[in-house]
């Protein structure tokens, strides 16, 4: 059984207003299935200055962290073996060691640790 799942939030070009419900639904479903991590793909934004989806995702994950549904999250730009949270996440879920975005500093993804 996989320890983590990838959720592409960009599919279907969703409205930012849909993100809180969608993220909460994904987190609750993953917790029920004993998934340890969720990799949210939200993109960076087509303007080159960052889009609206990325901050909306991270705001919602911060709320879920305060509610105890998410332990912590790692912004893709910090996803590195030199980052303490990334090492903690790899200890929690070994599959993260093989993730394609590790060391890519991809600010279009965020990892939620459940």
Where are these regions (language model features)?
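Long, charged, low-complexity intrinsically disordered regions
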Residues: 1-114
